[in-house]
Amino acid sequence: MPVGVPKVPFLNPNPDPEPDSVEEELDSMEEKATWVDLYNRLYRQRWLFLGKDLEEEVANNIVGLMIHLNIEDPFWTQTLYINCLGGLIIPGLALYDTIGFVEPDVKTICLGIAASMASVVLVGGTVTERCAFPNARVMIHQPRAKEFDDRFSDLNLEGHLFLQLRNCVTQIYIHRTNKPAWVIIADLERDTFMSATEARTYGIIDGVYAFEEEYEEWS
């Protein structure tokens, strides 16, 4: 039987008058604690997660959370943890644009893998705030289209749209990594896998976490 999402206590951050004793303080904390599911608790700390394929529902949920948290506190840095094999182009670009739209910095962290459109989201984080764990992997490649409709007019329209989207993704990598266009275009022609250190050298991330609190910055 599935265990489900665990619940954890959450205390209202608004301070109340200090209690007269330790016992009163403990009683007050127990009364005010609200039990919420684990992800809700993490969201309140501005820790967001992309752990599924990038489809409309997944992207819309994260976009909605980011905008809500931006309204609630426009100065509290948001952190997006990424372990994703990629997904659809349009939802991925929607998430990428939202990262640039919200007022607070958005730290993007790769754990596991950030492949395809997930690597676009990773590189879209605030510069100096994009990082990965030592054993993470990053993969970039050009967008791939599904089968087109047989009708010529639809084929022409969809082909034109696909070329626009492909150019958009290419320009994102060029702008965010500061790599020459010819390097990006050549690397997108195939599945290009990178270790965390290689992704840092490439310009997709800015640093690699080493051990717990230690953070190795690129210089």
Swiss-Prot record:
One of its GO terms (biological process) is protein quality control for misfolded or incompletely synthesized proteins. It catalyses: Hydrolysis of proteins to small peptides in the presence of ATP and magnesium. alpha-casein is the usual test substrate. In the absence of ATP, only oligopeptides shorter than five residues are hydrolyzed (such as succinyl-Leu-Tyr-|-NHMec, and Leu-Tyr-Leu-|-Tyr-Trp, in which cleavage of the -Tyr-|-Leu- and -Tyr-|-Trp bonds also occurs). The keyword Chloroplast applies. Its EC number is 3.4.21.92. Residues 1-22 are annotated as: Disordered. GO terms for cellular component: chloroplast stroma; endopeptidase Clp complex. CDD domains: S14_ClpP_2. Keywords: Chloroplast, Hydrolase, Plastid, Protease, Serine protease. It holds the Pfam family CLP_protease. The keyword Glycosyltransferase does not apply. GO terms for molecular function: ATP-dependent peptidase activity; ATPase binding; serine-type endopeptidase activity. The active site is at 116 (nucleophile), 141. InterPro entries: ClpP (IPR001907), ClpP/crotonase-like_dom_sf (IPR029045), ClpP/TepA (IPR023562), ClpP_His_AS (IPR033135), ClpP_Ser_AS (IPR018215). Its main location: plastid. It is found in: Plastid, Chloroplast stroma. SUPFAM superfamilies: ClpP/crotonase. Gene3D superfamilies: 2-enoyl-CoA Hydratase, Chain A, domain 1 (3.90.226.10). It comes from the Eukaryota. Cleaves peptides in various proteins in a process that requires ATP hydrolysis. Has a chymotrypsin-like activity. Plays a major role in the degradation of misfolded proteins. Component of the chloroplastic Clp protease core complex. Belongs to the peptidase S14 family. This is ATP-dependent Clp protease proteolytic subunit. The lineage of its organism: Eukaryota, Viridiplantae, Streptophyta, Embryophyta, Tracheophyta. The gene is clpP-A.
